[in-house]
Amino acid sequence: MAKSTGRQVYGIDMQMDGMVIATTRTNPAIGGGLNGFDAEAARQMRGVSAVLPITGGIAVVADNTWRAFQAAQAVECDWGPSPYIGDSADQFAAVAASFTNDHHDSRFKDEGDVEEALQDASVVEAEYRIPYLAHAPMEPMSVVVKLTEGRLDIWTGTQIPRFVKANMGRLTGLDGDDIHV
């Protein structure tokens, strides 16, 4: 009921004393890199404490969400190209082009007479296409991390908490028992 009434508390709703907010800005072309960036304007903005390069983009740390978002947009980024095909129409064309005669008659099993069976069969042909649909959870994607001496607490919407725990253990050097997701 809480989700349908807007009363659900998510990780993004967490507030702690001394908390800073980080946001990211990544290449709009899937898989594209970051050739370079100019963060001078963002670094001059009130409340911004850091602008850092990350894989495929930048991260901005600020004292509140609004300032982090504004600073991320103020960073001038030189984006690299994507190694992937751009839109659904191009993707469908690439898949269609991959259907070559090289594998047209390959079979794992060759039993019976297909041509004879098809002569008396009713044939239904159809083609269905749908665009890519990203996983879109109701919870805003976010993570809140609190690192204290020998303990790491993590609040996030995840379907794989063991993965989060293992990766955070590798990053922090903490034992799994000291990491709470």
Language-model region placement:
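Structural alpha/beta core scaffold segments of enzyme domains
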Residues: 1-181
